[in-house]
Regions:
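Residue-level signal for tight coil/turn positions that link beta-strands
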Residues: 32, 39-40, 67, 74
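Phosphoinositide-dependent membrane-docking surfaces
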Residues: 41-44, 52-69
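Short, surface-exposed beta-strand-loop junctions and turns on beta-sheet-rich folds
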Residues: 48-53, 76-78, 85
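Intrinsic-disorder-associated interaction segments
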Residues: 6, 80-83
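Short hydrophobic/aromatic-rich beta-strand segments that constitute the beta-sheet cores
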Residues: 42-46, 72, 79
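Anionic N-terminal interaction surfaces
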Residues: 1-35, 75, 88-99
Length: 99
């Protein structure tokens, strides 16, 4: 990723994965981009074909993992193919930490 990402002053990046991301939030969308795990949210940035940024905030939402799918509230994010980053570490960090 070559662009600057703006995070909140009290937000810390725990892990990042770049790859093919499948997002279901009522509609199925597939993007190639960066998936950031912070202490406050999952943040997706895609600059290929279309510029897209999407945040899934943890506050007040149930979060879980089901068959390698990250669940935040009613939203499901699946990493279908990881180009870079440690996906296993990312999944473990997501499931082990309570924010």
């Amino acid at each position: 990723m070559n662009r600057k990402v703006n995070f909140q002053h009290d937000e810390n990046v725990v892990s990042t994965v770049t790859g093919l991301l499948e997002i279901f939030d009522g509609t199925l969308n597939i993007y190639f981009g960066d998936l950031f795990l912070t202490n406050k949210r999952l943040y997706i940035v895609s600059t290929k074909l279309i510029n897209m940024e999407k945040s899934f905030w943890f506050e007040g939402e149930k979060k879980d993992i089901e068959h390698s799918t990250l669940i935040v509230g009613e939203h499901r994010i699946t990493v279908r193919w990881a180009y870079s980053g440690n996906l296993l570490y990312f999944l473990n960090a997501f499931s082990e930490n309570e924010w």
